[in-house]
Protein backbone atom coordinates (compact mmCIF):
# COMPACT_ATOMS: atom_id res chain seq x y z
CA UNK A 1 0.00 0.00 0.00
CA UNK A 2 1.25 3.48 -0.87
CA UNK A 3 0.44 6.28 1.57
CA UNK A 4 1.28 9.95 1.07
CA UNK A 5 1.08 12.48 3.94
CA UNK A 6 -1.14 15.44 3.12
CA UNK A 7 0.73 18.50 1.79
CA UNK A 8 1.99 20.73 4.59
CA UNK A 9 2.98 24.42 4.50
CA UNK A 10 6.64 24.85 3.49
CA UNK A 11 9.18 27.62 3.97
CA UNK A 12 9.07 30.46 1.42
CA UNK A 13 10.82 29.65 -1.80
CA UNK A 14 10.64 25.89 -1.37
CA UNK A 15 8.31 23.54 -3.16
CA UNK A 16 7.03 20.70 -1.01
CA UNK A 17 7.56 17.29 -2.48
CA UNK A 18 5.58 14.77 -0.48
CA UNK A 19 6.75 11.25 -1.11
CA UNK A 20 4.52 8.22 -1.28
CA UNK A 21 5.65 5.54 1.12
CA UNK A 22 4.75 1.84 0.97
CA UNK A 23 3.40 0.17 4.11
CA UNK A 24 2.86 -3.58 4.35
CA UNK A 25 -0.23 -4.81 6.17
CA UNK A 26 0.37 -8.48 7.06
CA UNK A 27 -2.51 -10.93 7.13
CA UNK A 28 -4.24 -11.08 10.55
CA UNK A 29 -2.84 -14.47 11.54
CA UNK A 30 -3.48 -13.61 15.21
CA UNK A 31 -7.18 -13.36 14.42
CA UNK A 32 -10.18 -11.32 15.46
CA UNK A 33 -9.15 -9.03 18.33
CA UNK A 34 -11.48 -6.64 20.16
CA UNK A 35 -9.61 -6.22 23.44
CA UNK A 36 -6.74 -3.95 22.46
CA UNK A 37 -6.18 -0.22 22.94
CA UNK A 38 -7.29 1.82 19.91
CA UNK A 39 -4.09 3.84 20.02
CA UNK A 40 -1.86 0.76 20.18
CA UNK A 41 -3.68 -2.10 18.48
CA UNK A 42 -2.31 -5.61 18.53
CA UNK A 43 -0.32 -6.31 15.36
CA UNK A 44 -1.58 -8.82 12.79
CA UNK A 45 -5.12 -8.76 14.17
CA UNK A 46 -8.53 -7.69 12.87
CA UNK A 47 -11.53 -5.73 14.12
CA UNK A 48 -13.81 -7.93 12.02
CA UNK A 49 -13.04 -11.37 10.63
CA UNK A 50 -16.18 -13.05 9.35
CA UNK A 51 -16.13 -16.28 7.35
CA UNK A 52 -12.36 -16.61 7.51
CA UNK A 53 -10.23 -19.30 9.14
CA UNK A 54 -6.90 -18.24 10.61
CA UNK A 55 -3.87 -20.36 9.73
CA UNK A 56 -0.23 -20.09 10.73
CA UNK A 57 0.63 -18.31 7.48
CA UNK A 58 -2.47 -16.26 6.66
CA UNK A 59 -6.24 -16.49 6.53
CA UNK A 60 -8.43 -18.58 4.23
CA UNK A 61 -12.06 -18.15 3.31
CA UNK A 62 -14.28 -20.81 4.88
CA UNK A 63 -16.04 -23.41 2.77
CA UNK A 64 -19.78 -23.51 2.27
CA UNK A 65 -22.54 -25.57 3.84
CA UNK A 66 -24.30 -28.48 2.17
CA UNK A 67 -27.67 -29.98 3.05
CA UNK A 68 -27.10 -33.47 4.45
CA UNK A 69 -30.37 -34.59 6.03
CA UNK A 70 -33.90 -33.48 6.93
CA UNK A 71 -35.39 -34.29 10.33
CA UNK A 72 -38.52 -32.16 10.02
CA UNK A 73 -38.47 -30.65 13.50
CA UNK A 74 -35.71 -28.48 15.03
CA UNK A 75 -32.51 -30.45 15.49
CA UNK A 76 -31.65 -30.56 19.20
CA UNK A 77 -28.62 -32.88 19.30
CA UNK A 78 -26.09 -34.61 17.06
CA UNK A 79 -23.84 -37.43 18.26
CA UNK A 80 -21.66 -40.21 16.90
CA UNK A 81 -20.78 -43.82 17.68
CA UNK A 82 -17.49 -45.49 16.78
CA UNK A 83 -16.33 -49.06 17.28
CA UNK A 84 -13.37 -50.34 15.31
CA UNK A 85 -13.94 -49.46 11.65
CA UNK A 86 -17.63 -48.77 12.27
CA UNK A 87 -18.63 -45.13 12.60
CA UNK A 88 -22.22 -43.92 12.79
CA UNK A 89 -24.00 -40.60 13.29
CA UNK A 90 -27.38 -39.80 14.82
CA UNK A 91 -29.55 -36.73 15.09
CA UNK A 92 -32.27 -35.99 17.61
CA UNK A 93 -35.30 -33.75 17.79
CA UNK A 94 -37.32 -33.24 20.96
CA UNK A 95 -39.20 -36.50 20.30
CA UNK A 96 -37.15 -38.78 18.04
CA UNK A 97 -33.65 -40.08 17.30
CA UNK A 98 -32.71 -40.65 13.65
CA UNK A 99 -29.89 -42.64 12.00
CA UNK A 100 -27.83 -40.31 9.81
CA UNK A 101 -24.88 -42.48 8.79
CA UNK A 102 -26.12 -43.10 5.24
CA UNK A 103 -28.61 -40.69 3.69
CA UNK A 104 -30.24 -41.51 0.37
CA UNK A 105 -32.22 -38.34 -0.27
CA UNK A 106 -31.38 -35.34 1.95
CA UNK A 107 -34.91 -34.01 1.48
CA UNK A 108 -36.58 -37.16 2.82
CA UNK A 109 -36.72 -37.71 6.58
CA UNK A 110 -35.32 -41.15 7.51
CA UNK A 111 -37.25 -43.54 9.73
CA UNK A 112 -36.61 -42.87 13.41
CA UNK A 113 -34.72 -45.40 15.52
CA UNK A 114 -36.19 -44.10 18.79
CA UNK A 115 -39.56 -42.36 19.16
CA UNK A 116 -41.80 -40.89 21.86
CA UNK A 117 -39.01 -39.08 23.68
CA UNK A 118 -39.82 -35.90 25.62
CA UNK A 119 -36.49 -34.05 25.34
CA UNK A 120 -33.75 -33.76 22.75
CA UNK A 121 -31.21 -32.17 25.10
CA UNK A 122 -28.84 -35.12 25.29
CA UNK A 123 -25.56 -35.56 27.07
CA UNK A 124 -23.62 -38.49 25.68
CA UNK A 125 -20.45 -40.53 26.07
CA UNK A 126 -19.00 -43.77 24.76
CA UNK A 127 -18.01 -46.62 27.04
CA UNK A 128 -16.32 -49.94 26.30
CA UNK A 129 -16.82 -53.19 28.19
CA UNK A 130 -16.08 -56.85 27.53
CA UNK A 131 -19.49 -56.96 25.86
CA UNK A 132 -18.68 -54.29 23.29
CA UNK A 133 -18.70 -50.55 22.78
CA UNK A 134 -21.73 -48.55 23.88
CA UNK A 135 -23.02 -45.05 23.20
CA UNK A 136 -24.75 -43.82 26.37
CA UNK A 137 -27.35 -41.02 26.28
CA UNK A 138 -29.05 -39.10 29.10
CA UNK A 139 -31.43 -36.13 28.90
CA UNK A 140 -33.04 -35.80 32.34
CA UNK A 141 -36.54 -36.49 31.04
CA UNK A 142 -36.45 -39.98 29.51
CA UNK A 143 -34.78 -43.22 30.54
CA UNK A 144 -31.07 -43.57 29.76
CA UNK A 145 -30.40 -45.10 26.34
CA UNK A 146 -27.58 -47.37 25.16
CA UNK A 147 -26.58 -48.12 21.57
CA UNK A 148 -24.30 -51.10 20.86
CA UNK A 149 -23.79 -50.70 17.12
CA UNK A 150 -26.98 -52.47 16.10
CA UNK A 151 -29.83 -51.63 18.50
CA UNK A 152 -31.00 -49.10 21.08
CA UNK A 153 -31.83 -50.42 24.54
CA UNK A 154 -32.80 -49.08 27.94
CA UNK A 155 -30.34 -50.34 30.56
CA UNK A 156 -31.68 -51.64 33.86
CA UNK A 157 -30.38 -49.06 36.34
CA UNK A 158 -31.48 -49.36 39.94
CA UNK A 159 -31.00 -47.03 42.89
CA UNK A 160 -31.50 -43.89 40.81
CA UNK A 161 -34.47 -42.94 38.65
CA UNK A 162 -33.17 -43.37 35.11
CA UNK A 163 -35.31 -40.59 33.65
CA UNK A 164 -33.88 -38.08 36.15
CA UNK A 165 -30.30 -38.58 34.92
CA UNK A 166 -29.48 -35.53 32.81
CA UNK A 167 -25.75 -35.76 32.02
CA UNK A 168 -23.25 -38.57 31.61
CA UNK A 169 -19.48 -39.07 31.49
CA UNK A 170 -16.91 -41.76 32.19
CA UNK A 171 -14.12 -41.86 34.75
CA UNK A 172 -11.94 -44.65 36.16
CA UNK A 173 -13.76 -47.37 34.16
CA UNK A 174 -17.15 -46.24 35.50
CA UNK A 175 -20.13 -44.42 34.05
CA UNK A 176 -21.15 -41.35 36.06
CA UNK A 177 -24.46 -39.49 35.81
CA UNK A 178 -25.87 -36.18 37.02
CA UNK A 179 -29.29 -36.24 38.63
CA UNK A 180 -31.01 -33.21 37.13
CA UNK A 181 -31.85 -30.22 39.35
CA UNK A 182 -30.01 -31.71 42.33
CA UNK A 183 -26.48 -31.71 43.69
CA UNK A 184 -26.15 -35.47 43.34
CA UNK A 185 -24.09 -37.61 41.00
CA UNK A 186 -24.57 -41.35 40.53
CA UNK A 187 -22.09 -43.97 39.36
CA UNK A 188 -22.34 -47.56 38.17
CA UNK A 189 -20.09 -50.51 39.05
CA UNK A 190 -16.75 -50.83 37.24
CA UNK A 191 -17.01 -51.85 33.56
CA UNK A 192 -20.82 -51.84 33.69
CA UNK A 193 -23.49 -50.15 31.58
CA UNK A 194 -26.30 -51.12 33.96
CA UNK A 195 -26.85 -52.30 37.50
CA UNK A 196 -27.07 -50.68 40.91
CA UNK A 197 -26.21 -46.98 40.84
CA UNK A 198 -24.60 -45.43 43.91
CA UNK A 199 -25.19 -41.81 44.90
CA UNK A 200 -22.35 -39.36 45.38
CA UNK A 201 -23.76 -36.18 46.90
CA UNK A 202 -22.10 -32.79 46.62
CA UNK A 203 -24.69 -30.97 48.72
CA UNK A 204 -22.15 -30.50 51.48
CA UNK A 205 -19.44 -29.48 49.04
CA UNK A 206 -21.00 -26.77 46.89
CA UNK A 207 -21.53 -23.52 48.82
CA UNK A 208 -23.23 -21.26 46.25
CA UNK A 209 -26.42 -23.23 45.76
CA UNK A 210 -27.66 -24.17 42.32
CA UNK A 211 -27.42 -27.73 41.05
CA UNK A 212 -24.87 -30.07 39.54
CA UNK A 213 -24.78 -29.40 35.77
CA UNK A 214 -22.19 -31.77 34.32
CA UNK A 215 -19.10 -33.78 35.10
CA UNK A 216 -15.99 -34.60 33.12
CA UNK A 217 -12.62 -36.28 33.20
CA UNK A 218 -9.68 -33.89 33.31
CA UNK A 219 -6.50 -35.47 31.95
CA UNK A 220 -3.53 -33.33 32.85
CA UNK A 221 -1.26 -35.11 30.37
CA UNK A 222 -3.77 -35.29 27.47
CA UNK A 223 -3.95 -39.04 27.97
CA UNK A 224 -5.53 -41.57 30.29
CA UNK A 225 -3.50 -42.23 33.41
CA UNK A 226 -3.03 -41.92 37.14
CA UNK A 227 -3.10 -38.12 37.05
CA UNK A 228 -6.71 -38.00 35.80
CA UNK A 229 -9.15 -35.97 37.88
CA UNK A 230 -12.92 -36.23 38.15
CA UNK A 231 -14.53 -32.81 37.80
CA UNK A 232 -18.03 -31.85 38.99
CA UNK A 233 -19.36 -28.47 37.77
CA UNK A 234 -22.42 -26.68 39.16
CA UNK A 235 -24.78 -24.23 37.50
CA UNK A 236 -23.21 -21.49 39.64
CA UNK A 237 -19.71 -22.19 38.36
CA UNK A 238 -18.41 -24.08 41.38
CA UNK A 239 -15.94 -26.81 40.44
CA UNK A 240 -15.27 -29.74 42.76
CA UNK A 241 -12.25 -31.83 41.77
CA UNK A 242 -11.56 -35.35 43.01
CA UNK A 243 -8.93 -37.99 42.35
CA UNK A 244 -8.97 -41.74 42.86
CA UNK A 245 -10.88 -44.61 41.30
CA UNK A 246 -13.61 -45.54 43.79
CA UNK A 247 -15.95 -42.87 45.22
CA UNK A 248 -17.13 -45.42 47.78
CA UNK A 249 -13.70 -45.86 49.34
CA UNK A 250 -12.24 -43.29 51.71
CA UNK A 251 -8.75 -44.59 50.93
CA UNK A 252 -9.23 -44.43 47.15
CA UNK A 253 -11.11 -41.17 46.69
CA UNK A 254 -9.88 -37.74 47.72
CA UNK A 255 -11.12 -34.20 47.20
CA UNK A 256 -8.46 -32.08 45.55
CA UNK A 257 -10.34 -28.84 46.09
CA UNK A 258 -13.34 -26.62 45.43
CA UNK A 259 -12.86 -23.74 43.01
CA UNK A 260 -14.95 -20.95 41.56
CA UNK A 261 -15.42 -20.29 37.85
CA UNK A 262 -17.93 -18.12 35.98
CA UNK A 263 -21.25 -19.78 35.18
CA UNK A 264 -21.06 -22.39 32.39
CA UNK A 265 -23.12 -21.99 29.21
CA UNK A 266 -24.59 -25.49 29.18
CA UNK A 267 -23.98 -29.12 30.02
CA UNK A 268 -22.16 -29.72 26.72
CA UNK A 269 -20.21 -26.45 26.77
CA UNK A 270 -16.79 -27.96 27.49
CA UNK A 271 -14.04 -29.91 25.77
CA UNK A 272 -10.76 -31.62 26.57
CA UNK A 273 -7.93 -29.80 24.79
CA UNK A 274 -4.42 -31.09 25.31
CA UNK A 275 -3.79 -31.31 29.03
CA UNK A 276 -6.63 -28.98 29.97
CA UNK A 277 -10.39 -28.86 30.18
CA UNK A 278 -11.91 -25.80 28.50
CA UNK A 279 -15.33 -24.62 29.72
CA UNK A 280 -17.46 -22.07 27.87
CA UNK A 281 -18.71 -19.68 30.56
CA UNK A 282 -20.56 -16.37 30.59
CA UNK A 283 -17.20 -14.59 30.90
CA UNK A 284 -15.23 -16.53 28.30
CA UNK A 285 -13.71 -19.87 27.34
CA UNK A 286 -11.85 -20.70 30.55
CA UNK A 287 -9.21 -23.43 31.10
CA UNK A 288 -9.93 -25.29 34.30
CA UNK A 289 -6.23 -25.03 35.14
CA UNK A 290 -6.76 -21.26 35.45
CA UNK A 291 -9.65 -21.75 37.88
CA UNK A 292 -7.48 -23.53 40.42
CA UNK A 293 -4.86 -20.78 40.60
CA UNK A 294 -6.68 -17.56 39.63
CA UNK A 295 -9.16 -15.48 41.60
CA UNK A 296 -12.60 -15.20 40.02
CA UNK A 297 -12.16 -11.46 39.60
CA UNK A 298 -9.02 -11.97 37.51
CA UNK A 299 -9.96 -15.11 35.64
CA UNK A 300 -11.17 -13.18 32.59
CA UNK A 301 -7.54 -12.45 31.74
CA UNK A 302 -6.80 -16.17 31.56
CA UNK A 303 -9.60 -16.90 29.09
CA UNK A 304 -8.69 -18.48 25.77
CA UNK A 305 -11.31 -16.11 24.34
CA UNK A 306 -9.69 -12.98 25.81
CA UNK A 307 -9.15 -11.36 22.36
CA UNK A 308 -12.94 -11.31 21.78
CA UNK A 309 -14.08 -10.73 25.37
CA UNK A 310 -16.47 -7.82 24.58
CA UNK A 311 -18.30 -9.84 21.94
CA UNK A 312 -18.32 -13.09 23.95
CA UNK A 313 -19.78 -11.48 27.06
CA UNK A 314 -22.44 -9.59 25.13
CA UNK A 315 -23.57 -12.78 23.39
CA UNK A 316 -23.52 -14.78 26.62
CA UNK A 317 -25.91 -12.25 28.18
CA UNK A 318 -28.22 -12.30 25.16
CA UNK A 319 -28.17 -16.10 24.84
CA UNK A 320 -27.99 -17.00 28.53
CA UNK A 321 -30.87 -19.49 28.33
CA UNK A 322 -29.38 -21.49 25.44
CA UNK A 323 -27.16 -24.56 25.41
CA UNK A 324 -23.77 -23.81 23.88
CA UNK A 325 -21.62 -26.63 22.54
CA UNK A 326 -17.91 -26.95 21.82
CA UNK A 327 -16.32 -29.33 19.32
CA UNK A 328 -12.87 -29.57 17.77
CA UNK A 329 -11.32 -31.04 14.65
CA UNK A 330 -7.67 -32.04 14.58
CA UNK A 331 -7.85 -32.29 10.79
CA UNK A 332 -9.22 -28.77 10.32
CA UNK A 333 -7.08 -27.57 13.25
CA UNK A 334 -9.84 -25.50 14.81
CA UNK A 335 -12.50 -25.53 17.47
CA UNK A 336 -16.11 -24.43 16.91
CA UNK A 337 -18.42 -22.96 19.57
CA UNK A 338 -22.13 -22.86 18.79
CA UNK A 339 -24.42 -19.98 19.74
CA UNK A 340 -27.94 -21.45 19.57
CA UNK A 341 -31.02 -19.31 18.99
CA UNK A 342 -28.95 -16.35 17.81
CA UNK A 343 -31.16 -14.02 15.72
CA UNK A 344 -28.04 -13.36 13.64
CA UNK A 345 -26.90 -16.97 13.09
CA UNK A 346 -23.21 -17.28 13.90
CA UNK A 347 -20.66 -19.58 15.47
CA UNK A 348 -17.19 -18.89 16.81
CA UNK A 349 -14.01 -20.49 15.48
CA UNK A 350 -10.54 -20.62 17.03
CA UNK A 351 -7.32 -22.05 15.65
CA UNK A 352 -6.14 -24.86 17.95
CA UNK A 353 -2.49 -24.09 17.37
CA UNK A 354 -2.38 -20.29 17.49
CA UNK A 355 -5.52 -19.35 19.45
CA UNK A 356 -6.59 -16.98 16.67
CA UNK A 357 -10.34 -16.28 16.54
CA UNK A 358 -12.79 -15.65 13.72
CA UNK A 359 -16.53 -15.95 13.20
CA UNK A 360 -18.72 -17.87 10.75
CA UNK A 361 -21.93 -16.08 9.83
CA UNK A 362 -25.08 -17.44 8.22
CA UNK A 363 -24.90 -20.80 10.01
CA UNK A 364 -27.75 -21.62 12.42
CA UNK A 365 -25.66 -23.87 14.68
CA UNK A 366 -28.10 -25.28 17.22
CA UNK A 367 -25.91 -28.35 17.81
CA UNK A 368 -22.60 -29.66 16.51
CA UNK A 369 -20.65 -32.85 15.86
CA UNK A 370 -17.79 -34.24 13.78
CA UNK A 371 -18.31 -37.38 11.71
CA UNK A 372 -15.87 -38.95 9.23
CA UNK A 373 -13.59 -35.91 9.36
CA UNK A 374 -16.40 -33.48 8.49
CA UNK A 375 -18.22 -31.03 10.74
CA UNK A 376 -22.01 -31.09 10.92
CA UNK A 377 -24.57 -28.80 12.51
CA UNK A 378 -28.28 -29.01 13.13
CA UNK A 379 -30.60 -26.05 12.65
CA UNK A 380 -33.96 -24.79 13.87
CA UNK A 381 -35.52 -25.52 10.47
CA UNK A 382 -35.03 -29.25 11.00
CA UNK A 383 -32.07 -29.61 8.65
CA UNK A 384 -28.61 -31.07 9.17
CA UNK A 385 -25.78 -29.48 7.21
CA UNK A 386 -22.21 -30.43 6.39
CA UNK A 387 -19.69 -27.73 7.27
CA UNK A 388 -17.02 -26.38 4.92
CA UNK A 389 -18.17 -28.21 1.80
CA UNK A 390 -18.22 -26.50 -1.60
CA UNK A 391 -18.20 -22.77 -2.19
CA UNK A 392 -21.74 -21.67 -1.36
CA UNK A 393 -24.21 -21.96 1.49
CA UNK A 394 -26.63 -24.37 -0.12
CA UNK A 395 -26.58 -22.34 -3.33
CA UNK A 396 -26.57 -18.99 -1.55
CA UNK A 397 -23.59 -16.67 -1.75
CA UNK A 398 -21.75 -15.53 1.36
CA UNK A 399 -19.14 -12.85 1.94
CA UNK A 400 -15.83 -13.15 3.79
CA UNK A 401 -15.14 -9.84 5.55
CA UNK A 402 -11.86 -8.60 7.00
CA UNK A 403 -11.53 -5.21 8.70
CA UNK A 404 -8.02 -4.56 9.93
CA UNK A 405 -6.99 -2.57 12.96
CA UNK A 406 -6.70 1.18 12.42
CA UNK A 407 -3.12 2.22 11.59
CA UNK A 408 -1.28 5.54 11.82
CA UNK A 409 1.41 4.32 9.38
CA UNK A 410 4.17 5.67 11.54
CA UNK A 411 2.90 9.25 11.35
CA UNK A 412 0.40 9.87 14.15
CA UNK A 413 -1.48 13.15 13.92
CA UNK A 414 -0.91 13.58 10.18
CA UNK A 415 -3.57 13.25 7.53
CA UNK A 416 -2.86 10.62 4.90
CA UNK A 417 -4.00 9.97 1.37
CA UNK A 418 -4.30 6.39 0.21
CA UNK A 419 -2.98 6.29 -3.35
CA UNK A 420 -3.21 2.62 -4.21
CA UNK A 421 -3.16 -0.80 -2.65
CA UNK A 422 -2.62 -4.35 -3.76
CA UNK A 423 -3.94 -7.39 -1.88
CA UNK A 424 -2.10 -10.67 -2.30
CA UNK A 425 -4.46 -13.62 -2.74
CA UNK A 426 -3.83 -17.27 -3.50
CA UNK A 427 -6.90 -18.86 -5.08
CA UNK A 428 -7.93 -21.71 -7.35
CA UNK A 429 -11.00 -19.99 -8.81
CA UNK A 430 -11.89 -16.48 -9.88
CA UNK A 431 -13.14 -14.17 -7.14
CA UNK A 432 -14.29 -10.56 -7.07
CA UNK A 433 -12.66 -8.99 -4.01
CA UNK A 434 -13.65 -5.50 -2.96
CA UNK A 435 -11.03 -3.32 -1.30
CA UNK A 436 -12.10 -0.23 0.64
CA UNK A 437 -10.58 1.90 3.39
CA UNK A 438 -12.14 3.18 6.59
CA UNK A 439 -10.84 6.23 8.47
CA UNK A 440 -11.34 7.91 11.84
CA UNK A 441 -12.31 4.63 13.53
CA UNK A 442 -15.42 4.22 11.39
CA UNK A 443 -16.19 0.50 11.31
CA UNK A 444 -19.17 0.81 8.96
CA UNK A 445 -18.66 -1.70 6.18
CA UNK A 446 -19.81 -1.16 2.58
CA UNK A 447 -22.29 -3.40 0.78
CA UNK A 448 -20.74 -6.71 -0.31
CA UNK A 449 -19.40 -6.93 -3.87
CA UNK A 450 -21.11 -8.72 -6.71
CA UNK A 451 -20.09 -12.32 -7.27
CA UNK A 452 -17.43 -13.19 -9.81
CA UNK A 453 -18.37 -14.74 -13.12
CA UNK A 454 -18.46 -18.54 -13.13
CA UNK A 455 -15.03 -19.75 -14.20
CA UNK A 456 -16.03 -23.40 -14.62
CA UNK A 457 -16.16 -24.84 -18.11
CA UNK A 458 -18.68 -27.06 -19.87
CA UNK A 459 -18.29 -30.80 -20.29
CA UNK A 460 -17.22 -31.71 -23.81
CA UNK A 461 -20.20 -32.58 -26.00
CA UNK A 462 -22.52 -31.78 -23.11
CA UNK A 463 -23.49 -28.12 -23.74
CA UNK A 464 -25.03 -26.12 -26.56
CA UNK A 465 -22.58 -24.55 -28.99
CA UNK A 466 -21.89 -20.90 -28.22
CA UNK A 467 -24.03 -21.12 -25.09
CA UNK A 468 -22.02 -23.00 -22.42
CA UNK A 469 -19.00 -21.33 -20.79
CA UNK A 470 -15.70 -21.99 -22.52
CA UNK A 471 -12.33 -22.73 -21.02
CA UNK A 472 -11.29 -19.54 -19.30
CA UNK A 473 -7.63 -20.55 -19.47
CA UNK A 474 -6.91 -18.95 -16.11
CA UNK A 475 -4.82 -21.73 -14.66
CA UNK A 476 -1.53 -20.02 -15.42
CA UNK A 477 -0.66 -16.68 -13.86
CA UNK A 478 1.96 -14.32 -15.22
CA UNK A 479 4.23 -12.89 -12.53
CA UNK A 480 5.58 -9.38 -13.04
CA UNK A 481 6.87 -6.46 -11.04
CA UNK A 482 4.13 -4.16 -9.82
CA UNK A 483 4.52 -0.62 -11.15
CA UNK A 484 2.61 2.33 -9.75
Q: What role is predicted for each listed range?
A:
Residues 97-98, 143-144, 184-186, 239, ...:
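Structural signal for beta-propeller blades
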Residues 232-261:
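Surface-exposed extracellular loop regions of Gram-negative outer-membrane beta-barrel proteins
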Amino acid sequence: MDVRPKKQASPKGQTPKPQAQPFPLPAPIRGWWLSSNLATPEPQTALALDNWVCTTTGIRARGGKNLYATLGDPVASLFTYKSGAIEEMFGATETDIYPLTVIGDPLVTPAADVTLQTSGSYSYTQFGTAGGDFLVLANGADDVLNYDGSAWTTPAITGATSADLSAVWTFASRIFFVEGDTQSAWYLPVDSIAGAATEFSLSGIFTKGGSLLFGAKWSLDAGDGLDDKCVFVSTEGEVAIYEGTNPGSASDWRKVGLYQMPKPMGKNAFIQAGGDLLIATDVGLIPISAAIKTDLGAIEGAAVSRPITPYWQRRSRELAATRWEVIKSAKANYMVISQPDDVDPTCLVVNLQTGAWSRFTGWDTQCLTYFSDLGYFGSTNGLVYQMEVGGSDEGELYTATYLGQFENFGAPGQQKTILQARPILVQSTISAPQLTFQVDYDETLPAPPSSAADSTTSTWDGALWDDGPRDSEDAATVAAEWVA
